[in-house]
UniProtKB/Swiss-Prot annotation:
GO terms for molecular function: aminoacyl-tRNA deacylase activity; ATP binding; proline-tRNA ligase activity. GO terms for cellular component: cytosol. Pfam families: HGTP_anticodon, tRNA-synt_2b, tRNA_edit. GO terms for biological process: prolyl-tRNA aminoacylation. Catalyzes the attachment of proline to tRNA(Pro) in a two-step reaction: proline is first activated by ATP to form Pro-AMP and then transferred to the acceptor end of tRNA(Pro). As ProRS can inadvertently accommodate and process non-cognate amino acids such as alanine and cysteine, to avoid such errors it has two additional distinct editing activities against alanine. One activity is designated as 'pretransfer' editing and involves the tRNA(Pro)-independent hydrolysis of activated Ala-AMP. Its EC number is 6.1.1.15. This is Proline--tRNA ligase.
Amino acid sequence: MRTSLLFYRTSKNANKEASVLSYELLQKAGYLFKTSKGIYSYTPLFQRVILKMTEIIREELNAIGGQEVCLPLLQPAELWEKTGRWKAFLSEKLLYVLKDRENKAMCLAPTHEEVVSEFVAQWLTGREQLPIHLYQIGTKFRDEIRPRFGLMRAKEFLMEDSYTFSDSPEQMEEQYAKLRLAYQRIFDRLNLKYVIVAADGGKIGKGKSEEFHVLCSLGEDTICVSGSYGANVEAAQAIPPSYVYDSNLLPVEEVATPNIRTIEDLEVFFNTPKHKILKTLVVKTRQKDSEKFFAICIRGDRQINLTKVASFLQVDDCELASEEEILKHLHVEKGFIGPLYCPIPCYADETTRPMTNFICANNQKDVHCKHMNWGRDIPLPAFGDFLLAEAGDLCPQNGGAPYEIFQGVEVAHIFNLGTRYTESFSVGFQDKNGDKQLCWMGTYGIGVGRTLAACIEQLADNKGLVWPLAVTPFSITILYNGGDTEGEATALQLYQSLNTEGFEPLLDDRNERLGFKLKDSDLLGIPYKLIIGKSFQSTGLLEIESRSGEKCNVSPENLLDWCSKNLPCHTRKIPPLQEQN
């Protein structure tokens, strides 16, 4: 391809909203055009990257028996109502909902578990067809409250989603292992630093679940890693530091604490460490159409993990109650809530069990109690694990070694769903006794745009993008000084030779200075530059410079040999762009 024919442009400045590196560089380098907030157009440059990324995905999924399908973007509400997810998703206000001319409710697809379950239920004829692995690569929609970070959190995005159907839990596990390995190979081919971590299934399902995270400072997710084990902070089991508490139980004292509401204020007021203060938080839960409130007690030096609370209470969703809700249901202001005489069900974290003579609120404004004790002063509650893991906490899955904390961008998620969806749609087969058995289902997804954005966050430098060879739009840029007719003739000859062999060169034939072209090539992230400089006339050697700065010289006669050793050949994967005469 010649730059004079390529529909693109570079710019010195990105959109003011480009708050992260990937978004900024994709705009500056001419890969992405903002159509509206959270909605983007892919330019010819980026579409080439997308095609190569999706080709890698197809190769790896086809290799394990995946069959590609195309499922509808427009989905009827009645399918979602069968699984109970219609109201759950509506409550979060993340669905794009519309009605057709017959007044039937529809949504734009955020995922396809319901649709694919209905499809397989109608077409599955017998056990001999199992396991089934269907996948697609297509657009998804999510009405983000705050779309930001470009492709990281968009309203419309490209995803690969796979669905497996098996005849038993064992076969489901086999399919899970195959998809897990295929996803690893996909990310390995991009040369990304990533971790696979245990995760919570959220609204998709409560079975076995893992996330793939690309490590980078931008990452919205906090990852706990200890040795070879990793977990999303929401799912990480951790052993926090323990403390020795008094064995001599002291008499309770009520203390006036005017407007002392926070743990930090209490720490100063009582001159006592946070781990001797009991913190009581009120959470609001949702289960289908019902809302309930619970009190959760944790140590004052720790933070609550709402995902763990929701799992413990077996509810769909959980969030901290607002000040207005607390006042309405507990008749006391936030900051003065305690477990004693609490009017709502109360639970406590395991780390609070050994606490003695602790400080806590007692549901009276401007009053706290000293020397409170479980059993003596407060009825012993049910205990659970409600803590958010922190750096230095010990990892029970790694022999008690400490956790390190990293930031990561979630680029893929894999789930075992069991029979949650197949039961709703009666997806099953007859066993040898003639009895109906349900299929066991798995669901898996890769965020294509997020993966490429994470790739940029991890690999880019102060010059611009740095694409892995596997997905770069062009493998090598051919550069010469504008106005150099001899250099132009040589460049054209080399370009035609490389193009014929499928090495995907980009010929910068603009009438610009060589220095300008070099900077543009770096901004675009092309892995190699083939430079026809001043020294070529005297030495007859071409200069090749990698995106990372390594240089070598090669003669025109040996160029194809060098390319065959260092560049991928995409002749069969990406059709060459048609050029005008």
